[in-house]
Amino acid sequence: MKLTVLVGGVGGARFLLGAQRLLGLGQFATPDDNARHELTAVVNIGDDAWIHGLRICPDLDTCMYTLGGGVDPQRGWGHRDETWHAKEELARYGVQPDWFQLGDRDLATHLVRTQMLRAGYPLAQITTALCDRWQPGATLLPVSNDRCETHVVVTDPTDQQQRAIHFQEWWVRYRAELPTHSFAFIGTETASATTEVTAAIADADVVMLAPSNPVVSIGAILAVPGIRAALRATRAPIIGYSPIIAGKPVRGMADACLSVIGVDTTAEAVGRHYGARAATGVLDYWLVAEGDQAEIDSVTVRSIPLLMSDPEATAQMVRAGLELAGVTV
C-alpha cells in the first residue's frame, strides 16, 4: 500500500511514527518485512526561515529527526542530547534574533542545507541527501522547492501600526499573543508543488491529512498551487484527522490561528473548513475524538480515540482511518 500524508511538525511527525508502527516501516521494521508498504510525507515549508544566514526548515527537520530516532523526546523537536554553545556565544556577541534556539548539533543540518542551496540544489534533493544520514524509513517531500513562507499581519506593540512579521517571530517570540489580523502565504503566487509531491498524491492508495495545525501547517500546504487540484483529482480516498479535541488543540496554538481566520475551535468547524471533496473541498472522511460531534455534508465522520500518546495508540488511529475507507493492511 502507498500511503501519502500531509503533515506539519511535531504532531505530524508523531502521526508518521504511528503510521510506521502500523505498516512495519522505519524503526518498526523487522527482517521479515517485504516492503509491501510505502509511506510518503508531504511536509509544510511555511515555517521555513533564514536565521543567522542559515536556511531553517523546522517541520522537515522535526519529521526527519523523529523518524530517524534522533529527536529530543522532551521537546518533540531538535536533537536528542543537544548542546547550546553556539547559541550562548552568539548571545555574548549580542547577535539577533536571540529568541530562536539553534542547538549545536542542529546547526550542522542547517549548514549542509544552506551550502547545498547556495550551490543550486533544490530543496527536495537536499532533503533526500539529509535523509541519507537519518534513514527515516519514509520519503519526506517538501511541498515545493520554491519560497512559500507564512507571514502574519499584526499590530506592532511599539507603534500600534499594522505590519507583517514572519510566522516564526509571531509563534516563537510573541507566542501568538499579539493582536493578529491575517496570515499571508508569501511566494505562493509564483510557487508550485513539486512533481514528486503531485505524483505521490496521484499514485497513492490512501491520502491522509495529519492532525497538524489546520491553518499554518495543513493550510499552508493547501495554499501551494497544484496541491488542491492534485487532491481533488486523486483516485485515493482522503482521510482527515481533527487536531481539536473537546474544543481545544491537542498541542500548539491552533486555536489562536483558527480565531484569526474566523473558524471556531471545534472538530466540526475544522472539518467544514477543509470541506468535502464532493463539493469544493478535500475530504472524503473525517475522524474526530470520542465525545466530539461533527456533521459535514458529503463527508463520512467517525469518532475514535485521537490522543497520540505513543506510537501504538497512533497506529490504531491510522488503522481506524484505513478501515473507515475500506482499506485493509
From Swiss-Prot:
Full protein name: Phosphoenolpyruvate transferase
Function of the molecule: Catalyzes the transfer of the phosphoenolpyruvate moiety from enoylpyruvoyl-2-diphospho-5'-guanosine (EPPG) to 7,8-didemethyl-8-hydroxy-5-deazariboflavin (FO) with the formation of dehydro coenzyme F420-0 and GMP.
GO-annotated molecular function: LPPG:FO 2-phospho-L-lactate transferase activity; magnesium ion binding
Keyword Signal: no
Record-listed E.C. numbers: 2.7.8.28
Family to which this protein belongs: Belongs to the CofD family.
Names of required cofactors: Mg(2+)
Listed pathway(s): Cofactor biosynthesis; coenzyme F420 biosynthesis
Binding positions for 7,8-didemethyl-8-hydroxy-5-deazariboflavin per the UniProt entry: 61
UniProt keyword terms in alphabetical order: Magnesium, Transferase
Assembly with partners or alone: Homodimer.
Catalytic activity, reaction form: enolpyruvoyl-2-diphospho-5'-guanosine + 7,8-didemethyl-8-hydroxy-5-deazariboflavin = dehydro coenzyme F420-0 + GMP + H(+)
GO biological process: F420-0 metabolic process
Top-rank EC class of the record's enzyme: transferase
Entries under Gene3D superfamilies matching the protein: CofD-like domain (1.10.8.240), CofD-like domains (3.40.50.10680)
Record has Ribosomal protein as a keyword: no
